[in-house]
Amino acid sequence: MDRYFFLQDASTVAKLLLGNLLIRKIDKKEIVVRIVETEAYMGITDSACHSYSGKRTNRTNAMYNIGGYSYVYIIYGMHHMFNIVTADKNNPQAVLIRSVEPVSPLLGEKCVLTNGPGKLTKFLNIDLAFNKVDLIGNNELFLQRGLNLDFNIVCSKRININYAQEDDINKLWRFYIEGNKFVSRC
């Protein structure tokens, strides 16, 4: 996937990421997962977004990069959230990767838990070291076009954003592959 792909707005990229592959290399081993659920955060006009009203902090600085960079942060003091920055530099939008479906064979894994944003980062060993990483040309964490992009997309309200304004709470900016068993539960 090239830079141009990520220069679109977050709601467009969030839909287009579905079915594509996220690849994590750990100790010469590749873990391949298929993105099955995303949420769009539309920047300074979206009260659910960390960069709402142009808020810029050490944590949100990653969102001000050009599209294609990662934005990783911690919630509840223990769960890492993996986002992909979209749009132009200084237009702080991002897509939260909410759930993924394992594709590569996993040696020694009996039960894979990737149906939630905190679970998938734990599974893929994504932590703050992956904040502000350019995902284009990176060797440890990168995206690749999926082979099967024939599916229905469900649009719904985003999850756990009760702090946002009502208009933003009601936006249908959560996207997932219909019928996929790895989609997170609300």
Swiss-Prot record:
It holds the Pfam family Pur_DNA_glyco. One of its GO terms (biological process) is base-excision repair. Its EC number is 3.2.2.-. It comes from the Bacteria. InterPro entries: Formyl_transferase-like_C_sf, MPG, MPG_sf. GO terms for molecular function: alkylbase DNA N-glycosylase activity; DNA binding. Keywords: DNA damage, DNA repair, Hydrolase. Belongs to the DNA glycosylase MPG family. HAMAP family: 3MGH (MF_00527). This is Putative 3-methyladenine DNA glycosylase.
